[in-house]
Regions:
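Hydrophobic/basic alpha-helical segments enriched in Actinobacteria
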Residues: 22-23, 27, 88-90, 98, ...
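Active-site scaffold of zinc-dependent metalloenzymes
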Residues: 47-93, 103-122
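An acidic/histidine-cluster motif and surrounding catalytic segment
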Residues: 1-43, 49-63, 77, 115
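Amphipathic alpha-helical interaction/coupling elements
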Residues: 9-12, 91, 95
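Short alpha-helical functional segments enriched in proximate histidine and acidic residues
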Residues: 16, 20, 95, 99, ...
């Protein structure tokens, strides 16, 4: 898949996040990269996305405005593991939701629990 098509999958996944959450996402950049940076993930692990920033729950109104937080979605790992175009779109959506959960201050266990609930409610 070319990068533009993958970007469209990421954008569509982000648009499916309920507006009440998207409205609260200020100063965050949604970025697509071909691969995770070397050394970011250990052997035997796959990194689909990465949230970098200060979670919303850890911010103060007294803090100065900072550089944008970043949610990066990695194209290569998704494409290598996807079994079909539909599966790829589903994986991308799961990854976007996962990283948005981190933006809102959820730890890994909380994000995974929310993902399980979301999957059963689809």
């Amino acid at each position: 898949m070319n990068p533009g098509e993958f970007d469209q999958l990421v954008e569509a996944a982000f648009r499916r996040i309920p507006a009440r959450f998207r409205k609260r996402m200020a100063n965050v950049a949604l970025i697509v990269e071909p691969e995770p940076p070397p050394g970011r993930v250990g052997p035997g692990y796959t990194l689909f996305g990465l949230y970098e920033g200060r979670p919303l729950t850890h911010r103060s109104v007294f803090e100065p405005i900072a550089m944008p937080d970043r949610i990066t979605i990695f194209q290569g790992p998704h494409e290598r593991l996807a079994r079909s175009p539909e599966h790829l779109a589903s994986m991308v959506e799961d990854t976007v939701w996962h990283e948005v959960g981190h933006y809102f201050g959820m730890n890994e266990a909380q994000v995974r629990a929310a993902q399980r609930r979301r999957r059963t409610n689809r």
